[in-house]
Each structure stands twice: as C-alpha cells, then as structure tokens.
C-alpha cells in the first residue's frame, strides 16, 4: 500500500473524540454564562485561541492566559501541543467536558499593537484598509447580489430506499410509469410566476446584453459600511517618555468620535483610559469628569463605547447592512491566502477613498515594536514550515495551512515591491549598470528583471529566452512544492508582470549573496554551485552529497542520468542525475538547494529545427522552447502502459499470473525504465538514443496531443475565450506556440468534415431517387400485393419497435466548433502578440507616459475605421519632462500597428494572417477585453464604439476634458506681457480611447502556490466510499474535506471555489438538491471574486448553478441564473457560441415539460436561429432541433406547426443520414400521422359545415334536416365513395394525449438514442 493510500485509509478510519470546553470568561467581558465550545482532542492551544478569536463573545480579548484549575496552560505548554497530550501530562483521564478559565494578562507594547489591529478589524476599518491597499481598483468584487434570486427551495433528500422504490416502479408497464412520472413532475405555476418566466424568457431571447456601464457595476457591500469613529491615530505625544514608562504607560493614541469629540487615550499595562493631554499640553494623568467618574477599561472597545453613544449603534447598523446586502458572507469576506481578481472594466466613481488618518500608521502598529515584523527571512520561514512533522492528518493540515499562508504573504509583499521597482521608487544594488541589469534586495527578497543579465542565453535568444525560461523555472518550482521531496529545497518564487515589464522575485539561498567569507587572496570569487554547470559555464560540479536527495526529483520529472560534455573540454565526472543547467547549491543554513529549474523538461526539438534560425527576420524569438510537464507525463504514461501490457502478456504465457492464496501477483516495473535526457540537443557527444527519445516526445505533441485535442473539441464544448483555450491546451500539455498550427488544422478539419457531409448527402439523395423510381414502378404494376406487403411492413415495423432505437446521425456542432476554435485561436494569437508589442515598445517609454501610449496603440489597432491616423494627446504639464525619443510612439498609426501585429503573430505563432484580418477575423470588443486582461489594464466602464455609426451616437456623451496653456495678455498698459494660463477645456472625441479612460494598471502575478496532495487523497477516499455504497460515510468525508479546504486555503480562494463546484455536483448526484443549490451559489461568488466576474470559470459556475436550481424545481431562479450566464457569455465570446444552441434547446424542453409551451417555443426558435447561422439551415443539428421543437409543438396542440418542423427534420435526416435511419423513419411517421389527423379534422369540419348548411336550408323550407351524424350514416349505407380522407374511427372523440399517442405510432413513447460515442452535454 502506498503512503497516499495509507493516509487516506487512516483518515477514513480515524475516530477522534469530541469534547466540550466550558470556558469561564474574565470580568471585562459582559457575559454572565460560561462559553461552551465544541473541540477535538487533536486540536492545539493555538486552535482554541483561533476559535476564541472568531467568537463574538471573546473576539475583542487579545491578551490572555488559559488556565486549567491553577495551572497556566499558556506558559507551561507550547501552542502547537495537542489537547490530548496536555491532558495526558496533567493526568486527566477520559472526559466529556473540560473546564477552563481565561484570565487577562498585563499588556506590553507588542500586545497593545495587536489589540489596536484587532479593534480596527472588529469595528470594520479593515474593509477600508483592504480597498486602499489593493493593487487593483475594486479587486475581489462580485455581481451575484444583482441577481433577483429567491431562497433555495428546501426539499427532502432522496434516500437509497427512494431510489430502490423508484427502480421497482420502473419495472411495471410503461403506461403506468409515464403516468407516475407526469404526476410526480407536474408543477402548478401561479399567474405571477408564469409572468416572471415569460419576462426572463423574453430577456434570454432578445439578444440585448446589458451595457458596458452595467457590466462595470458590481456589488458594493463594503462601500455601504459606515465607520463608527472618525479617526484613531497614534498620538503626537508618542512614543512614551522614559519617566512615564516606569508608570506603565505604553502608548498614547488620539480618538475622534462621531460626536466630534477629540480624546487622548493612554494605553497602559492595565488597560486603556482617557488622560488629560490636549493638542498643546501633555498631561498623561487619568482624566476625571465633573461627576468624579473616570473612563477606564481593559478592552479598548468597551472604553470607546462608553465615550461615544453612536459607536455601538453604528456597528449594529453595519452588521445589519452586511446581512441585508448579501446572504452569503463569501461575497464580502476578506481573503486570507489569495490575491483577488481585478475586473478589467470598472466604474471609478463607485470607489470612494475614505479619510482615515490611522491608515498611514498601519505599518507602525502591524510590524512589531521595532519594525522587525516587516523584515522577514522568507526563505527560513518557508523551509522551517516544510520541516514540520507531517505524520498525521492534523499535522499535515497545519503544515499545508502555514505553507499556503507563507506563500501568499510572500506574493503580496513581492508584488508591491516589484511595482515600486518598475516605478523607479527603489535604489538598486548596482546603480552604475544599465537599467535592465539592475538588481534589488528588499525585505529578504531578491528582485531582478527578466532579462539576459548573466549572458547565459546569448546564443539562444537573449532577453526573449531569459523571459521564457523564468516562467519554466516557476512551473518546475510549483511542481516541486507539490512533490515535497525530503532533503532538497527550492526557492520561494513569484513572477510579476507590470506595465510590460517582468520582475522575478525570489527569497535567495542563504549566503549566496554574501562575499565576506571569500578568500581575499583568491583572484576569482568562489563559485557557490556544488552540482551542475558553474555560473560562468567553465566547469561541471557533481557533489556526491546531492545524488540521493535529487533522485526523487529525477523520478518525478522522469530524468535520465547522463554524462555531459561541453566545448573546451568541460566534462562531468560521471553521470549527472538532473540537467546540467539545474544547479545544486549549499546554503549557509546547511540546507541543499536546487535552482534554475527551467531545464526540467526537454527541448521541443522538432519545433526548433523548423522555426528557429537567427539569420532570418521571421525566426522564432528564441531556442529555449521547452515542452510542458503535462506532455512529458502523458508520453511517459503511454510508454509505461505499453510496457505493462507486454509484461502482462509475457507473464500470462509463462503462467506466472495465476492467483495464489486468492491474491493476484503484482506487476512492478522499474521506475527508471522510461526516462529522458533533458540535456539532449544542448551539449556535444550526445547519445543518439537520448536524442531519439527527445525527438519522439517532441513529435508526440503534433502527432497525438494536438490531434486528440482537435477531435475532442469538435464534439465537446468549444472554448469561451482566450483564457479558456489556454487552460484547455495547457492541461493537455500543448504549448501556445502551436496556436497557429491549431488554427490551420481547425480549417482543414472543417473542410474535411464538410466534404464528408457532401459525399454522404450525394449518396443518400441517389438512394432516395432510386427508391422513388421503384415506388413509381410498383404503382404502375398494380396493387395486388399491397395488402401482403403492408402486412409484412407492419410486422417489420413491430420488430424494429422492439429493438433499441439508435440513430447514426452526428448531432454535435462540428462545423461551428471548428469555426469557433479558429476564431478564438486567431484572437488569442493577436491578443498575445499585442501584449508582446506593448511590452517591447514601452521598454523605452517613461512609466507615466505608459497610459498615453497604451490608449494610442489601442486607437491605432481598433479604431482604424474611425481615425486611421489618431493624434496622441499628451498632458501639457508632462511634455516638458520628456525628449523626442521617448515620445516616438506618438508617430504610430493604424497601418503601422496592424502590420506590426501581423508580423508578431507570424514570428511567435508561425501563422500568416490575411491582409484584411482586422476587419474579417476579429471582433473588436472581445479583442479589447483580451488585451486588457493579458496586459493588466482596468478601463473606465463606458460605451466604446468601434464603428463610425456607433461612434457618432456616443461621442457627444463622452466629451474629453483636457488642460491646456492659453496665452493671456496683461491689462496693464505699462506692462503688456504674454502670460500662460492653465485652463480646462471640454472637447469632442476624435478617437475611441483617451488617456483618462485607463483607470489603473494591475500586476499579473504568477506564483508557486500549489494544489495540496492531502485534499486529493481525502477526496479519493470519499469517492471510493460513495462508489462502494457507503453514501453517508462518503458525504461526511466530503463535508470534512470542505473544512480542510477552508483551513488550508481559506474561505476565499480559487481552489476553494473549484471544490464548492465539485461538491455541488456530488450533492446533486446523491439527491441532496437543496444542499447542491446552496453550495453552487457560493461557487459562483467565489469564482467571480477570485478568477474574474466574466471568466470562463464564473460562467460555468453560473450554468451549473442554474442546472441545479432546475433539478430542485425552482425554475425562476434557474432562468435568472441562466440569463446572467448567457449575458456574460455573450460579452466574452460575442453572439452565437456553438454550445449556446444546446443551452437554449435544453431550456426549451425544460419549460415544455411543465406545459409552458409559449415560452418553450420562443427558446426553440432562438436555438434554431443561432444554429442556422452557425451550422447551416440544412445540417443534422438543425434537423435534430426541429425534431425536438416539433415534439414540443405537438405537446402544445399546435399540429400544423409541428407538421412543418417534422417535414423539415425528415428532409434533413433523409438527405444527411439516409432514409433507413431511425430518425428518418420516426420523423416520417410523425409527418404521416399528423397529416392523417389534420386531414381527418378538416373532413370533420367540412361535414359539420355541410350539415349546418343543410339544417339552415331545411329550416328555411320548414323541413327537418338530418343531423351530420345521420348524414354520414346514410352515405355510408349507400356505399358512396368520398374523395376526401376518410375519418379514422380509432381517433374519433379521443383526448389530446390519446391523439398524441396515435401520431407517435400508437406505441408508448420511446426515447430515441444517439450513437454511444455521442455524449450529451449538460449544457
């Protein structure tokens, strides 16, 4: 059993006793009763403190000791010791409850700082702190609150007994089963509900998406919060003078209440009190009011409450606002372990900067009494956490939680500092070197720009290669963090891309930057590398102490030990376990570190040989094109599978697989049997076998992975946007440099499919023509054998009815999917090329001119129809600071920019765009969004017009205010001088974008945060329990896993969001419908806040949530959620995504099941309309839609319209899948039976008219006429023949349901099945 399985099994079997903690609270807390807290014996004192910190009763108590009887647990035991160990040491036996006492501790300055921070959090100032410190505007917002949703309908969960009972019922007759199903699913809607459904349906089909202003408006929950005080600052009288320190004074603070009263407060070791100091006089003595009363309390919040009548009232109002604004705390909770997503479009007026004098003092009270909290040894912190014990589940949870917290704090600090590096706010360590080579060391983090500063990539692409390898290094670090190999350490790393520049942030190896220990007599400095290629490339080290610790890494990356030979007789002493470029370094902390991991996967040699040639202008930018780890892993798995199969067959032949003692022998393959040399094609004297293996993996991308991706894409969901496509490709191990090849192949495959359809249609039309001729021939030969043939046909039909009905049609939108893939691929190539151009051109542009440059570039690219030579307007107050070279970008025009983009696409993606690509292949708005997300631009939410017609409509509303200097002559006659005066003018727009439209630039952060292996193990255990039928145990494990996710990642995190989505699916499958809906709603909120309000993850979360609401029989909520998803979908993709057809059709069937035929018909017509544009009028998917629509029309009693749909469907089916296909026959049957029924109806109406006419005539002649029935009987007796279709007595006087059964062939309705390889999308 593997360690993973063992830990999972331990989790499943672990039974930890729960006890109740009865906690007596100190006198400063006005709570007469003891606090009861459920706890596990496995929890630590730190966990108990955390629980108390979250409890409403004790959240303000920050400085206390925990006592058991007279024993101070806080002083006698470490905070990380489990409660079980404490009780054992104290000699306490098995108990169900434990009595503890909390006692106040005397404050010190550090405790005062902690208390002030907690006070700010409790009163709500941390919300303002969060918004003011975010690098983006309105980061982490959601739009979920804008949707008009009712509470989730509570339903009884389906038990296994219910499912068994349902299974038994299905064994009865089909008629009974259908009746039962109809009764069970029948829902009665009120008139108001029907009106709501109709309104939402009309919105769904209207195609009118909300304006961009509405899209840029988000839930503003935190903005509704009022501050219960005006300010709380460190007083001007701080720090405490020496003569007051001995009296217990620790800090002086100044409070301004909502009543405009300013008070000076002393923070004393015994608590807080108002002193006699004023703005100009210092008097630290306690203040007494006119009644002889003093204001003093151990808790600051109690003191402020006694001083300000409005204080508690405002806090209560804020709590009410939060509860009313959202029923889900996830929408406003501040994340603990994750950077939030910043929307690409925002309304800056919604972001008001609240005054708070204490905000600028936060670094003082948040980083310790001497500022030491700000200076962190990030590497030591991270590695020390990694070395914590992890033998039990609880130890692993604690360890993972601390690792995630450490990584997040590192990312946050590194990002903020990197932005200051790019803005030029910091002094480099090497100021005399060129700007690109500057390096920085700040707060334990080393910063360098992503350039070829060391010269390592001089021959393989220079700066482009250096930039690329930095991201490959990070990808390998991320994987190593997950592998968690013992004895070897990697660096904490993140990459920050901001305003076109890349900064690599790493916690350095201890001692690597320290040159003080080097021998002064040595001519050259000692190389710190112990394993791998030296820094200058002159020597290869192979310290034997690294060999054992590197083996787990080599195994994870499937690396082959190999000798290395370079030029100038640089050789390795024996085999290297890893690549020569991966370096092993010993730190001064005696740990072994591994750095420069960009060569963890081999080169894509096939791509290099085809596309890299430095002598050509159109060469790929660099030679460091590495394969993705996912591709290598997939190649390795398939090779192992082949070997395993061969070994199994060999052992079977030898009879060695026979079971012994009921157990089958295990087949174990050596882990090093399939390995790869990642140094292949980078050295000399290489093994041909090594090169062949690398070439094989390189070919594997095009020959297998891309082919499989194209096949899957043709029949599954096409990507929504560029990020979705990127994610899909990366998961399958395909590098984005293949986007051009994918675009080409999408067109090729589309043409092949159309050709296949044309050929099939030709064959079917010939068959139809042949049958028609045979039918006519038979008609002329006579009808003697008609009855026998009809009888034979009936028998054959009955036999076919008894068989399972399977259609050979292809009902996936294959053509539309390939068109969609092609368009998204081209859009992604263009967007990424624009990002690189913005980066390269802006390298020489000063930071404060970047907004002007970016807006001008957008005008040239997207505004050519409006102004092909747009003027770039620079603020007059800035022009004087910059030279002509720095303003060179203002000479760009549309033709130049479009040509630059096309050339960049060719260089980076090996794809040649057609000359008219900007007008024929690109949707301007969607490209505008993609560029914003990739470069990190936040645009003002307003209407952006990309055509002349649209621009004329909006330009007056978007007049530009600009400041210009205007000459003004002095009025004095003696001194007539020209003076320049700065005035503000409002001028009409001549371009789509202006500089002020850019609200902010946000950094794009790539970090080394990884997915915990522990959560995967627990999830697999839960899934196994459910699969075995232990549903309750499985659900309990899933619920526990949710708690684990929240502990490790925090409640607001992308991984937590994904798990909420997964958990809702499992709940729905297990019949827990209400729970599924509630969890799915949280998934929507978290996806919006962490991945973006319009990301593909958010849209998918909304669609899933809508689906779960519909399964819970709450169709109004479901339609509202679908409406939100489709609006965002249209914004992201544009009109007509292939999968939207199925979404509309499924919604239509959903409504038709509940007799809402009018709304269902509208949705079907919308689906058919979109499908016609995407797939063509005569396509199999349109035929299937019309077939389904016909069924809905039948259900609503609209037989004539149904007949039209079935006729169209039959025509399509016979042409494309042949007249013998089940769908062709079924649709023909519908056509025949409906025609017969309609003819009978017409005959009935005609007879009734005749009868009425005769009756009227007889009445006039005073002669009694026979009734219509009598007339029919009479004519029948006389044996007269009627040319009209004869009435069928079987369908006379039948109910609508019976008529439908007759039309369907008098057989119980069967569900038509497609080919088994056609999967039905949930959409």
Swiss-Prot record:
GO terms for biological process: intracellular distribution of mitochondria; mitochondrion organization. Its main location: cytoplasm. mRNA-binding protein involved in proper cytoplasmic distribution of mitochondria. May associate with the eukaryotic translation initiation factor 3 (eIF-3) complex. Belongs to the CLU family. It comes from Debaryomyces hansenii (strain ATCC 36239 / CBS 767 / BCRC 21394 / JCM 1990 / NBRC 0083 / IGC 2968) (Yeast). Keywords: Cytoplasm, Repeat, TPR repeat. GO terms for cellular component: cytoplasm. The lineage of its organism: Eukaryota, Fungi, Dikarya, Ascomycota, Saccharomycotina. Residues 1308-1323 have a biased composition (Basic residues). It is found in: Cytoplasm. GO terms for molecular function: mRNA binding. SUPFAM superfamilies: Hypothetical protein c14orf129, hspc210 (SSF103107), TPR-like (SSF48452). Residues 150-186, 764-801 have a biased composition (Basic and acidic residues). TPR repeats lie at residues 103-141, 530-563, 1042-1076, 1099-1132, 1141-1174, 1183-1216. This is Clustered mitochondria protein homolog. InterPro entries: CLU-central (IPR033646), CLU_dom (IPR025697), CLU_N (IPR028275), CLU_prot (IPR027523), GSKIP_dom_sf (IPR023231), TPR-like_helical_dom_sf (IPR011990). It comes from the Eukaryota. Residues 351-608 form the Clu domain. PANTHER family: CLUSTERED MITOCHONDRIA PROTEIN HOMOLOG (PTHR12601:SF6), EUKARYOTIC TRANSLATION INITIATION FACTOR 3 SUBUNIT EIF-3 (PTHR12601). Residues 149-186, 764-808, 1250-1323 are annotated as: Disordered.
């Amino acid at each position: 059993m593997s360690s993973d399985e063992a830990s999972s099994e331990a989790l499943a079997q672990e039974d930890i006793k729960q006890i109740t903690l009865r906690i007596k609270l100190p006198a400063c807390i006005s709570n007469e009763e003891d606090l009861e807290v459920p706890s596990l014996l496995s929890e630590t004192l730190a966990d108990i403190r955390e629980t108390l910190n979250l409890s409403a009763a004790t959240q303000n108590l920050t400085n206390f000791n925990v006592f058991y009887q007279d024993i101070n647990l806080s002083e006698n035991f470490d905070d990380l010791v489990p409660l079980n160990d404490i009780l054992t040491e104290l000699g306490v036996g098995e108990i169900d409850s434990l009595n503890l006492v909390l006692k106040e501790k005397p404050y010190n300055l550090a405790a005062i700082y902690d208390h002030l921070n907690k006070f700010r959090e409790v009163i709500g100032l941390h919300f303002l702190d969060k918004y003011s410190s975010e690098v983006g505007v309105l980061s982490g917002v959601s739009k979920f609150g804008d949707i008009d949703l009712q509470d989730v309908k509570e339903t009884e969960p389906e038990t296994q007994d219910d499912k068994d009972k349902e299974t038994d019922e299905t064994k009865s007759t089909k008629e009974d089963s259908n009746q039962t199903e109809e009764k069970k699913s029948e829902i009665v809607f009120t008139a108001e509900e029907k009106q709501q459904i109709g309104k939402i349906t009309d919105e769904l089909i209207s195609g009118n998406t909300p304006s961009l202003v509405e899209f840029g408006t988000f839930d503003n929950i935190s903005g509704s919060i009022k501050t219960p005080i005006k300010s709380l600052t460190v007083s001007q009288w701080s720090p405490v003078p020496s003569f007051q320190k001995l009296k217990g004074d620790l800090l002086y603070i100044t409070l301004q209440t909502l009543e405009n009263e300013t008070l000076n407060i002393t923070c004393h070791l015994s608590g807080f009190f108002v002193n006699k100091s004023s703005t100009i006089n210092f008097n630290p003595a306690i203040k007494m009011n006119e009644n002889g009363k003093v204001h003093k309390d151990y808790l600051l919040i109690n003191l402020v409450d006694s001083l300000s009548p409005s204080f508690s009232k405002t806090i209560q109002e804020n709590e009410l606002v939060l509860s009313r604004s959202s029923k889900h705390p996830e929408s406003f909770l501040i994340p603990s372990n994750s950077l939030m997503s910043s929307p690409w479009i925002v309304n800056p007026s919604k972001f008001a900067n609240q005054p708070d004098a204490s905000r600028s003092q936060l670094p003082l009270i948040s980083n310790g009494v001497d500022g030491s909290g700000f200076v962190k040894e990030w590497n030591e912190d991270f590695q020390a956490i990694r070395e914590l014990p992890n033998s039990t589940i609880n130890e692993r949870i604690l360890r993972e939680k601390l690792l995630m917290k450490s990584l997040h704090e590192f990312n946050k600090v590194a990002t903020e500092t990197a932005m200051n590096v790019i803005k030029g706010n910091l002094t480099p360590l090497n100021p005399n070197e060129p700007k690109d080579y500057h390096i920085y060391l700040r707060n334990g983090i080393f910063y360098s720009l992503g350039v070829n500063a060391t010269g390592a990539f001089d021959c393989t692409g220079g700066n482009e290669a250096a930039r690329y390898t930095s991201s490959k290094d990070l990808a390998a670090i991320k994987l190593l963090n997950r592998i968690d190999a013992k004895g070897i350490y990697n660096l904490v790393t993140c990459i920050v891309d901001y305003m076109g520049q890349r900064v690599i942030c790493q916690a350095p190896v201890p001692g690597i930057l320290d040159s003080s220990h080097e021998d002064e007599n040595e001519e050259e400095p000692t190389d710190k590398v112990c394993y791998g290629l030296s820094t200058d490339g002159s020597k290869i080290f192979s310290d034997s102490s690294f060999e054992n610790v590197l083996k787990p890494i080599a195994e994870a990356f499937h690396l082959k030990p190999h000798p290395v030979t370079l030029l100038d007789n640089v050789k390795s002493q024996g085999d290297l376990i890893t690549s020569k470029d991966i370096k092993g370094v010993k730190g001064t902390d005696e740990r072994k570190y591994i750095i420069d991991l960009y060569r963890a996967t081999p080169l894509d040699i096939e791509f290099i040989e085809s596309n890299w040639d430095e002598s050509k202008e159109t060469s790929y930018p660099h030679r460091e094109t590495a394969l993705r780890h996912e591709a290598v892993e997939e190649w390795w798995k398939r090779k192992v599978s082949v070997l395993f199969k061969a070994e199994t067959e060999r052992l079977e032949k030898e009879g060695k697989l026979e079971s012994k003692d009921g157990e089958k022998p295990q087949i174990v393959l050596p882990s090093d049997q399939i390995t790869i040399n990642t140094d292949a094609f980078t050295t000399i004297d290489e093994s041909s076998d090594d090169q062949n293996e690398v070439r094989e993996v390189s070919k594997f991308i095009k020959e297998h992975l891309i082919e499989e991706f194209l096949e899957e894409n043709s029949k599954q969901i096409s990507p929504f946007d560029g990020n979705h496509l990127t994610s899909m490709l990366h998961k399958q191990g395909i590098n984005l440099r293949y986007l051009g090849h994918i675009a080409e192949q999408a067109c090729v495959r589309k043409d092949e499919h159309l050709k296949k359809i044309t050929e099939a249609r030709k064959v079917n039309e010939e068959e139809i023509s042949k049958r028609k001729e045979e039918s006519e021939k038979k008609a002329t030969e006579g009808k003697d054998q008609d009855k026998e043939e009809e009888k034979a046909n009936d028998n054959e039909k009955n036999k076919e009815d008894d068989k399972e009905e399977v259609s050979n049609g292809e009902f996936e939108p294959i053509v539309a999917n390939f068109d969609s893939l092609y368009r998204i691929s081209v859009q992604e190539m263009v967007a990424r090329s624009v990002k690189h151009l913005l980066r390269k051109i802006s390298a020489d542009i000063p930071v404060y001119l970047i907004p002007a440059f970016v807006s001008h570039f957008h005008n040239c690219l997207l505004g050519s129809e409006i102004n092909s030579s747009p003027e770039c307007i620079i603020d007059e107050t800035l022009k004087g600071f910059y030279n002509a070279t720095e303003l060179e970008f203002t000479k760009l025009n549309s033709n130049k920019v479009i040509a630059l983009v096309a050339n960049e696409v060719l260089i980076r993606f090996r794809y040649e765009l057609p000359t008219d690509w900007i007008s024929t292949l690109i949707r301007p708005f969607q490209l505008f969004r993609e560029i914003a997300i990739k470069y990190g631009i936040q645009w003002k939410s307003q209407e952006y017009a990309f055509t002349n017609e649209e621009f004329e409509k909006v330009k007056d509303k978007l007049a530009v205010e600009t400041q210009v200097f205007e000459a003004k002559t002095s009025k004095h006659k003696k001194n007539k001088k020209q003076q320049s005066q700065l005035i503000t003018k409002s001028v009409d727009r001549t371009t789509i974008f202006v500089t002020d439209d850019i609200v902010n630039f946000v950094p794009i952060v790539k970090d080394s945060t990884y997915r915990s292996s522990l959560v995967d193990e627990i999830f697999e255990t839960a899934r196994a329990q459910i699969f075995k039928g232990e549903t309750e145990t499985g659900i309990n494990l899933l619920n526990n896993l949710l708690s684990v996710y929240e502990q490790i990642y925090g409640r607001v995190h992308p991984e937590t969001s994904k798990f909420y989505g997964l958990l809702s699916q499992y709940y729905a499958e297990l019949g827990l419908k209400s729970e599924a809906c509630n969890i799915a709603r949280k998934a929507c909120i978290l996806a919006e806040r962490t991945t973006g309000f319009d990301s593909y993850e958010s849209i998918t979360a909304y669609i899933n949530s809508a689906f779960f609401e519909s399964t819970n029989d709450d169709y109004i909520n479901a339609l509202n959620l679908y409406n939100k998803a489709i609006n965002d979908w249209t914004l992201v993709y544009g009109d007509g995504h292939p999968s939207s057809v199925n979404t509309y059709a499924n919604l239509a069937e959903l409504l038709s099941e509940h007799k809402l035929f009018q709304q269902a018909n509208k949705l079907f017509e919308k689906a058919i309309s979109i499908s016609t544009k995407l797939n063509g009028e005569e396509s199999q998917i349109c035929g299937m839609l019309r077939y389904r629509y016909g069924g809905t029309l039948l259900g609503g009693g609209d037989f004539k319209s149904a007949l039209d749909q079935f006729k169209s469907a039959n025509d399509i089916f016979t042409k494309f899948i042949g007249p013998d296909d089940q769908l062709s026959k079924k649709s023909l049957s519908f056509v025949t039976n409906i025609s017969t029924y309609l003819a009978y109806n017409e005959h009935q109406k005609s007879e009734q008219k005749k009868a009425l006419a005769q009756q009227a005539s007889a009445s006039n002649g005073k002669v009694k006429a026979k009734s219509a029935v009598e007339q029919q009987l009479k004519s029948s007796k006389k044996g007269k023949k009627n040319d009209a279709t004869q009435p069928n007595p079987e369908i006379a006087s039948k109910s609508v349901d019976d008529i439908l059964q007759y039309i369907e062939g008098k057989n119980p309705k069967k569900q038509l099945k497609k080919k088994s390889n056609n999967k039905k999308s949930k959409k």
